[in-house]
Amino acid sequence: MTLQSPLTFRDEQINIGELKQELEKFSSYQKEEFLQHHPVTNLVLSRAEYMDLLLNRLWQHFGFKDIHNISLVAVGGYGRGELHPLSDIDILILSNNKLPNALEAKISEFITLLWDLRLEVGHAVRTVDECAEIGRADLTVATNLQEARLLCGSEDTFQALKKVVLSDSFWPSETFYRAKIQEQRERHARYHDTTYNLEPDIKSTPGGLRDIHTLSWVARRHFGATSLLEMSRYGFLTDAEYRELVECQDILWRVRFALHIELRRYDNRLTFAHQAQVAEHLGYVGEGNRGVEMMMKEFYRTLRRVAELNKMLLKLFDQAIINGGASEDAEIIDEDFQRRGALIEARKPALFQARPETILDMFLHIANDSSIEGVSPPTLRQLRTARRRLNKFLHTIPEAREKFMALCRHPNALHKAFSLMHKLGVLAAYLPQWSQIVGQMQFDLFHVYTVDEHSIRLLKHINTFSYAENHSKHPICCEVYPRIQKKELLILAAIFHDIGKGRGGDHSVIGEGEAYDFCIEHGLSKPEAKLVSWLVRHHLLMSVTAQRRDIYDPDVITEFAKQVRDEEYLEYLVCLTVADICATNPELWNSWKRTLLAELFYSTQRALRRGLENPVDVRERIRHNQQMASAQLRKEGFSAREIEVLWQRFKADYFLRHTHKQIAWHCENLLRMEDTSKPLVLISKKATRGGTEVFVYSPDQPALFATVVAELDRRNFNVHDAQIMTSKDGYVLDTFMVLDQHGKAIEEGRHSAVTKHITHVLEDGRPTKIKTRRTPNKLQHFNVKTKVDFLPTKSKKRTLMEFVALDTPGLLAKVGRTFADLGINLHAAKITTIGERAEDLFILTSEAGGRLSEEQQTELREKLIEKLSDSVSA
């Protein structure tokens, strides 16, 4: 492609149509060059150079070249000579004195032409004095002016501006530094102070391009350094740090350039909508979401490196330059370390290189001394150097292994040491498997954090079980955790539970073997290694069983108890499970999940104490529930005969699957009904089992489950569990466990309206129309293949169906309608939403009351996939 230099544009070419054509040709050329993997630095700089030439030519065309004491100045990122495809082109039209009206009108025409060309131009028209006044009052303006670069016009006017900007009175170096530090803190806070955001902003997120800019702004203000290279020449950063920053900037620039050629409007957010295409542009390919995950892994690792360098260099700048090298007196800890203020520092300049195991000593001191808040900047620099020069992982050093296990056994390590070890790259330097999960993301809405960040948060959540104030939120764990004798085993299981992710295959199986080998290598006994590896292998077992299996079925409890083996394993597992859920996504943990896990924990505990050879006597449980419910009903004034007549209508399963309190609540209201042929809808006034219980009694009718679910969906409620039963005389006795959109029980003020609407649709007898809503934008970029599997079960009468699909609006109602269309009876439903995925379990029987035949299973699978495909495409 032949490109014409803007300087050679003839006057007749300077019109909107032809200029747009030339700009489009240039952008297409740059896109082609980028996709052919030309260096992004060249493209970013050449784009700014092209814009320089274009603005010069237009400046000349409008006759500004002949006007004295006026300058066209590039500021901000454009002033640095850097432009991405959608970057703002910030310019300043500078003069010595206020411009006459005629000239202002001409400048307005100039700016309008730039806008008509769809260039993202930000402009200001100011005198030198105005720049000085506004710049002193506004940090952003001062920063932009600091990067000012003359494009064309009066050199004298521009130099007058530079003289003002470079003067100490404009922004003293220390004042500027403090202001920039505060600005960065506020920016980081907007992104939750983490480099790990699911849809990160390439420019502004912690560790992003702005963190590099902040370093350069501070150095430019103090030294006058105009580039990263000059910063290294002034000693602000070492040659190795300079090379690392350049490398990181190049990676971030490539991602940003790829994003910009994909977008129509300026944005720096790497959203789900564009991650796959950006990954493809950058050459990351793989099955499914593998390409995206590979790209994001490198991206997150880059953010970590920039954030670490930014923090260290700014602290060094503060200590060595702003404070003139003055520091507090050192307090000696031992021969290797001392404490200076709240920071620990090495006493020897090459300590970590000479004896790498002393790195772990430093973290033991941090765990021991609550007054130590961090590591001194020079020691951070030494640690980074030593880390790069390690020729083997730290775990291969016997002394390091002893110190690592001492940390695992230290009561304060969870609170302070491990998160800092991760942040400073020590866990990755210790354990090769950990280095593989750093920055490992999962392309979904469920896992809010990368694998490494999630694992660190899991450790922090385990630590919260030590504090009594968390008992109401985590009653079982706060009761169990203090009596766990070897907490280091739980810590190791937490470190290894997801360590196999990103390598293909079952991450639990991969982690199981690696955890066992690690434990043996670190001197643990075989039974201890076996416990840790079992926890890693089965870390999802309790969560899956509680949320996706029928935990009111004695066979399910017995099978789970067999896998758990004994109470010790159960106590370790419940702590790991709860911490894992809480560390996956802050919005996941709610009272409903707490109740499910508590019921599973205590049912399993009873089964283990009773002995697995002594299973639950179903008849005894039914008898117990009936006796307790009857006693409660008789207290309310009902006779034994009234109760008996009502209960003769119910099947035994009703008394097995409800507590005596539920039975009494249902029956009290049924016995008070004047006409028991009409529907009855009850809503629990208090949250029960962590949610709102909706009980429906009604003559059976086609698609009743779908009707009730559709009505609840219309009110934006989510069904998480359903028990579907019929009486001997054809009445339904259905119980729905319902939460609102925020995972909480339904507000009492809405109960009467919900009761009224469900009663109305049941009396009407016609299936409720499923409310059609657009699939939320955040779900549109995920592809969840609909899967229908039929699980093995001991039951000869019932079929277990596991169902996975994209969690689109009205999904459960559509599934229920399909069951009704095929004459399939639903007995129970367990509804689990995992990010964008619905993972549900249904217990079904055929119209004849038995298990579904293979033909019926095939037909059901085909109909569900067909119906959901139609709704998604619609």
Curated annotation (Swiss-Prot):
GO terms for biological process: regulation of nitrogen utilization. Residues 451-573 form the HD domain. Uridylyltransferase (UTase) activity is inhibited by glutamine, while glutamine activates uridylyl-removing (UR) activity. Keywords: Hydrolase, Magnesium, Multifunctional enzyme, Nucleotidyltransferase, Repeat, Transferase. Residues 693-777, 800-874 form the ACT domain. Modifies, by uridylylation and deuridylylation, the PII regulatory proteins (GlnB and homologs), in response to the nitrogen status of the cell that GlnD senses through the glutamine level. Under low glutamine levels, catalyzes the conversion of the PII proteins and UTP to PII-UMP and PPi, while under higher glutamine levels, GlnD hydrolyzes PII-UMP to PII and UMP (deuridylylation). Thus, controls uridylylation state and activity of the PII proteins, and plays an important role in the regulation of nitrogen assimilation and metabolism. Has four distinct domains: an N-terminal nucleotidyltransferase (NT) domain responsible for UTase activity, a central HD domain that encodes UR activity, and two C-terminal ACT domains that seem to have a role in glutamine sensing. Belongs to the GlnD family. This is Bifunctional uridylyltransferase/uridylyl-removing enzyme. It comes from Vibrio campbellii (strain ATCC BAA-1116).
